[in-house]
């Protein structure tokens, strides 16, 4: 049986997040629903228990103040992966610092690629559909008139669980508020 993976995300429950969720459904209607989010720690196995990971999150995030990020332009990770995303402009260095601080102890993991603060729009099956999705997403995002600023104050620790015999469902485990300790579990 495959080990579950864990991640730390900041959900976007605002007009920008709704825009991305609607765009994702349009670009790839077969994908299961995935809430719009910024990834602080990409998926990884734990180097210990869930409890020890939550303790690390509580300790480190409790000492971090909430901060604002601004969403930038639509970009793609092609040819590395067929992923279309919105780059984080202002606040990206703060996200990177938080990522580095949290990549320790039970959450420590050598990631395959360098950490790039971003909001994933969609991951396609291959490069050609990703390029098409990129063009469409870039055009739509240029016409988005809502706020591109996001206050990061609450993060969510999630686990990939099995549904229909495959690891493909992310479950919220704990909510962590920056500047304070764990809120719920």
Regions found by a protein language model. Give the residues of each.
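Histidine-dependent nucleotide/RNA phosphoesterase domain, centered on the 2H-phosphoesterase fold
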Residues: 1-185
